[in-house]
Amino acid sequence: MLYYAAPMEGFTDRVWRQTHQKWFGAQGAADRYYAPFISPPENRVLIKKKMAELAPAANPGAPVIPQLLAKDGELAAWMIGQLRALGYTEVNLNLGCPAGTVTAKGKGSGMLRDPAKVDAFLEGVFSHAEGPVSVKTRLGVEKPEEFAAILEIYNRYPISELTIHPRVMRQQYRGQADRAAFAAAPPRCTMPVCYNGDVTTAAQLHALEEEFPALSGIMVGRGLIADPALFRRARGGAPATKEELRGYLTDLYHGYTELFGSAGCAVSRMKAHWFYLIHCFAGAEKLEKQLKKLREPWEYEVVVNQIFTLPLVKND
């Protein structure tokens, strides 16, 4: 079964994708890296700075899948054409983002409020776009029972793969992913199905593979940020060593400093990564508080050095 890295705004950018592959290698890399969503410009004029994230030269290694956030099917199809011209084979459509700033515009999982709009959107996409187009979705807006009508629409189109995150929009990321609701979906899907949601350990990956052997893949987001060696461990390899984590985080810090042109901006991005990674270190509670408060690069470097004097927590 294939393992995918989920698209996460502020985390799974090109700096992270390259650094993850460098430090965790073939055994620990994702089979596919889904890039954080981009929105097609309404004037159909591409902004070079925004497209730099998907420049093929900046994305060697494992396949990268661009993700689009849109509500105009024809505009999305045009953008798919632009991405095909860059050499991308598959493009993913985001019908799952639960952020209020997105859903208020009728995009992401906000589109699921009206299945007729989902139908019109996909009609616009598939009438004008060529090649594989996959979809990432939630179960609905208010309750999982909404998914039956939504899936009926998905089944009308040649979607190359359907990634299902079994929460509804209103949940955001609260509560637990609804595995029971997910289990009802694959037998009714006409396309390959990928699972996404609340996967944080190798044991959970293996349990999903055993329970749903027909899945095309499993997509992991926060779990992979919290344990960058997760896929390696699931494939029978070793947990991350302190030396690997040190090199990985140092390269991320330097990469973000170069990308943003500012070590201060890089510190802000690194603090987001440390929110998940700090729990790899035993007894880091006091340093975690310091990490949250600091702002200056020199403060960050001092605290990180202190964190790396601590022992690692034993993985499952």
What are the language-model segments listed below?
Residues 8-82:
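Glycine-rich, positively charged N-terminal anion/phosphate-binding segment
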Residues 8-10, 38-40, 69-71, 96-98, ...:
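Active-site beta-loop-alpha junctions enriched in small/polar residues
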